[in-house]
Amino acid sequence: MLIFPLINDTSRKIIHIDMDAFFAAVEERDNPALKGKPVVIGKDPRETGGRGVVSTCNYEARKYGIHSAMSSKEAYERCPKAIFISGNYEKYRTVGDQIRRIFKRYTDVVEPMSIDEAYLDVTDNKLGIKSAVKIAKLIQHDIWKEVGLTCSAGVSYNKFLAKLASDFEKPHGLTLVLKEDALCFLAKLPIEKFHGVGKKSVEKLHDMGIYTGQDLLAVPEMTLIDHFGRFGFDLYRKARGISNSPVKSDRIRKSIGSERTYAKLLYQETDIKAEISKNAKRVVALLQDHKKLGKTIVLKVRYADFITLTKRVTLPELTRDAAQIEQVAESIFDTLPEHTVGIRLLGVTMTNLEDKMADIALDLS
């Protein structure tokens, strides 16, 4: 007997677009001399004393086992000939905006998950095209022709399957998962490939002898619920290709922030407050981009000994005024206990966000 009802909406047409090695691909596009060479987006460990992490890398670098979140030091050890590039977020954001405008030609129901991936619901699209595969191919063509980059696309009747499909054939792949093929497609996948199943859950599933979608399909609903609570029911549905989560074109952001890690530790108050100011102005630019105002300002400070302090102040009214955010963030810093070691990381974040297009003066100078 099922504890929760199983409702499977297979009427939708969902596309998941995932840009191929996005940051690295932009750098290769802008500097053709990089093509065919291992490119890592991250600080060169030879210049930082071994500090820093890999943001992303191109497919040539991945041949050496380099991946996102790996330490730059390990990436260099794996591939000493790798070319390290610090990266240019403003440039990547501009390209990301260009790609999103392409999406909007086909549908307004677009849910960006990050700067380089998004879900699109094309069930009722602007051009009246019945085939989601055709739309995915048109988007791939438009992005290549206009932006000079490749992307991978997954097409299915829900977000879960579309996401898995986009990762199935990279780079520049297109995979369709029909409702009649979903169980077979999932059965062959390692459980760690299931989107939304984290590392700890994977370890627990392995302990239960569950390694593939086929293994998961064989486990009774109550067994999964006993081990994982309500998430067990989610696993039960995933094994059957069921996910009715809508594509949310108005996806709510809970916070907007900017933080930076420093290769050279910060000691002087003037330097520290100058960096707080930079982060505050970056937050204001992001608030403006997303048409948001915020009420709570959060300052994050991490010291060289990795002690991290976070403190917040909630304002009486919503704002996105750079001078106010900067002043509050600096005043928060002044209240922190003295620390004898340098600062490794500083971050400013705005939470309690609301949509409000009031005429607010933006001081970005």
UniProtKB/Swiss-Prot annotation:
Give the reactions, separated by semicolons, that this protein catalyses. Answer: DNA(n) + a 2'-deoxyribonucleoside 5'-triphosphate = DNA(n+1) + diphosphate
UniProt-annotated location(s): Cytoplasm
Please give the superkingdom of this protein's source: Bacteria
Positions of the catalytic residues: 117
CDD domains (UniProt xref)? PolY_Pol_IV_kappa
Q: Give an example GO molecular function.
A: damaged DNA binding
UniProt site (Substrate discrimination) = 23
Read off the Gene3D superfamilies from this record.
Answer: 3.30.70.270, 3.40.1170.60, 5' to 3' exonuclease, C-terminal subdomain, DNA polymerase, Y-family, little finger domain
For the protein in the UniProt heading, the enzyme class is transferase
UniProt record, GO biological process: DNA-templated DNA replication; error-prone translesion synthesis; SOS response
Subunit and partners: Monomer.
Q: What is this protein called?
A: DNA polymerase IV
Question: From which organism does this entry originate?
Answer: Streptococcus pyogenes serotype M3 (strain ATCC BAA-595 / MGAS315)
Chain's gene name? dinB
